[in-house]
């Protein structure tokens, strides 16, 4: 965990929170394009957690508070899926290795999606789940979570390695 002074902590946290809110709320303001930007909302929180775990947690909660003002449904989805995914990836990727990070981070959105579907009843998830049997729905959610977590972990690892190389060059 990197030590940060308070000014850097606040500035970096604010920038990453802003990026995460923009990406997560993109489907609200740009319905077609926003669906492609929304998955990128995991990356700012993961970057914050890689840099400093308390920073990742602060960004996570400030992200939820700001997003609640914009759209409560997006905030709930964030709380149980992409937000926790970012925290898990950021905490484990460079501390425990990519395999542990992929396995742990794929469980989080899987359980979150099941919770959003069967406990909270988010309409988009309920409509999808009603089209299939429960076992098939669970399998689809797990497969999607595993693929999504895998892509996020690999992309983030390559991105951080690229930034590290840039820092060494300059």
For each feature predicted by the language model, list its residue ranges.
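Membrane-helix interfacial "entry" motifs
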Residues: 1, 5, 9, 74, ...
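Alpha-helical membrane segments and adjacent membrane-interface helices in multi-pass membrane proteins
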Residues: 33-90
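Aromatic-anchored segments of alpha-helical transmembrane domains
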Residues: 20-25, 64-70, 107-116
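Membrane-water interface at transmembrane helix exits
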Residues: 24, 28, 49, 67, ...
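Membrane-embedded alpha-helical hairpins and interfacial helices in multi-pass inner-membrane proteins
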Residues: 101-170
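Hydrophobic transmembrane alpha-helices
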Residues: 2-50, 55-58
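Hydrophobic alpha-helical transmembrane segments
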Residues: 10-15, 35, 57-61, 76-80, ...
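Short helix-perturbing small/polar motifs within transmembrane alpha-helices
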Residues: 13, 80-121
